[in-house]
Amino acid sequence: MPVDPNAEIEVTSFKWVPPFAQGFVKDMRVRWALEEIGQPYSERLIGGLFEEQPQEYLADQPFGQVPVYKEGGLTLFESGSILIHIGDKDERLLPRDTAERGRAISWMIAA
């Protein structure tokens, strides 16, 4: 599912990262999860990996990193918490069975 500028969900990404970090920045995990379930999302691009982020961004992400996830009035940071939230909304990503859910979360945190 392509990025949809009108989608209710917004994921923050860096405009630029150095070659050694490409593919390893944690917003990729969130975007991948949304793509897997066909959930449209918009993308907010902020400065590069080593740039100081604007104060208004630090209110959403106190470490100045990515991603930040916004949906309606909800704002989350840290990819693990965002992935659990997305998984809670869609069983294809996070099983309801306690044992299976625990295994899925173990792999999610390890990744």
Language model regions located:
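GST-like domain detector, emphasizing the conserved glutathione-binding G-site
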Residues: M1-A111
